[in-house]
Amino acid sequence: MLRDVQRMAGVSNSAAYRHYADRDALLAAVTDYAETRLADAMVARMNAVANRGPKAKRALGRLRATGQGYIDFALAEPGLFRTAFGHSGVGRGGHTRQAEGAETQIKSHHPFQILIRCIDDLVAVGVISADRRDGLDEAVWAAVHGLSTLFLDGSLSEADAHRKKLISDRLLDVIGGGLQ
């Protein structure tokens, strides 16, 4: 992908490396850009949820919207979506190891952090009890990411847009229903 961009820009293959310390720094910057764009899409969908009505319904609506934003982004920007998750050890899921055994740090405007805040909101408004909280972030992430990946590169890649929308709606229904 980088070489395609360099060719379109009319610069040499080594030009990008003049701006970064090494290959890992360059890949981290590209990954960060892709993750930020994905997070922006999720937040845009979440912000479109009406801010009136029962708190529980709003919180569930925001969670659903972030999931839909995630799936929509994957379908609209498959290259960026793959880039956000395609470089092992670089920006992987927004996680950065500070030291051996240190807790994982996640940047605040990362798709996973947005999901965490949505689930925290569900606990705060009483949709989910605190004792059911552990593991929900990863479970919801896996479901939405898995479906997005199946749409792009898996057995659902040949499904038409209508079918993908139907399947997305069903998955988001199952997630929302399972949390209540």
Each language-model region and where it sits:
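Helix-turn-helix
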Residues: 1-25, 29
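Alpha-helical structural segments
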Residues: 8, 25-48, 61, 65-72, ...
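Short helix-capping/turn signature of helix-turn-helix
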Residues: 20, 86-90, 142
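Short, flexible helix-adjacent loops and helix caps
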Residues: 43-51, 86-89, 124-127, 152-156, ...
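Short helix-coil transition/hinge motifs at the ends and kinks of transmembrane helices
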Residues: 48-59, 91-102, 158-160
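Amphipathic alpha-helical packing segments from all-alpha helical-bundle domains
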Residues: 57, 93-127, 134-138, 166-177
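Amphipathic C-terminal alpha-helical segment
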Residues: 73, 117, 121, 141-159, ...
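Amphipathic alpha-helical segments used for helix-helix packing
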Residues: 73-98, 149-157
